[in-house]
Each structure stands twice: as C-alpha cells, then as structure tokens.
Amino acid sequence: MKCPFCGNSDSKVVDSRPDKGGSGIRRRRECEQCAKRFTTHERIEEMLPLVLKKDGRREPFERTKIISGIKKACEKRPISVEVIERLVDRLETRLQESSEKEISTTLIGEWIMKELHDLDEVAYVRFASVYRSFRDINEFMQELQELLKK
C-alpha cells in the first residue's frame, strides 16, 4: 500500500478490525520508510448492475461518484460522513437485491432523493435541483411546494 506521506509502497499492517458497518475491514498501517501511520479500508467487490446513463452509455456503478454527489448536497448540514456511507450502503444493497443487469440513473436518483427527503429536506432540495435539472424557477418552486405539503 502506497504511503500517503512519503509515497513509499512498503507498509506493514499493525491493526485490522471490521469497519463499523461490518461490510469491510479497517486496517492501520505503518510505512516502513517514514514510520508514519495511516488507515486503509477494504471492501468486498460486489457484483452490481451496470448504470444506464441518460445518453445511453453504460458504466459500472461507482460508489465514490454517489458519495461525492450526496456530500455536495449535504454540505454545511448536520449530516456525518458515516450517515452518508450508510445511505450508500443501503443503495448498494438495493441494487444487489434488484437482480437487474442494468439500472438507470433515473431510478438511482429517485432512490437517493427518497433517502435524502427522509434525512434532511435541505439536502434533498439541493440534490433534486441538480438531479432533476429544472428548466426554470417555476419548476423549482413547484418541487418546493410539493415538499412543503408533506
């Protein structure tokens, strides 16, 4: 594992334990060159469906892209990284259970918006404003009105 401090590729594992969700392993490593310690996380590579993009392209599911988008929506909100990770864990579980070979970005986006709606309304509105690509302020206001009715 490459050291984030000095770039050396030799390190030793000094501690291993399951991560909080139990779906991976957290390892503490020590660089054999600079002796600094750092943490790595291992996860099982899941067999997830391909993501069908709006333009017809197919891409592998990328957890980091989903987390990045959700983090942007949750910026400056009282939502921890752990909560976001669990949200994405639930999304991945749902994708695996779907047994589909391909799944549209539209459906993934709807699932995320449902989770965010239940979690934090401001994060929901932020995510929806990007995901739904409102054509004008009226469409955006209509979404806000729907949110206020609930």
UniProtKB/Swiss-Prot annotation:
Domain ATP-cone stretches: 49-139
InterPro entries reported for this sequence: ATP-cone_dom, NrdR-like_N, RNR_NrdR-like
Start-end of unnamed zinc fingers: 3-34
CC cofactor note: Binds 1 zinc ion.
Region of interest (Disordered), ranges: 1-26
BP GO terms, sorted: negative regulation of DNA-templated transcription
Metal-binding in keyword set: yes
Keywords: ATP-binding, DNA-binding, Metal-binding, Nucleotide-binding, Repressor, Transcription, Transcription regulation, Zinc, Zinc-finger
Pfam family for this entry, one: Zn_ribbon_NrdR
Any one GO molecular-function label of the UniProt entry: ATP binding
Cofactor(s) in the UniProt record: Zn(2+)
Record-linked PANTHER family: TRANSCRIPTIONAL REPRESSOR NRDR
Protein family per UniProt: Belongs to the NrdR family.
NCBIfam families, alphabetized: transcriptional regulator NrdR
UniProt function note: Negatively regulates transcription of bacterial ribonucleotide reductase nrd genes and operons by binding to NrdR-boxes.
Protein's UniProt name: Transcriptional repressor NrdR
Organism ancestry: Bacteria, Pseudomonadati, Thermodesulfobacteriota, Desulfuromonadia, Desulfuromonadales
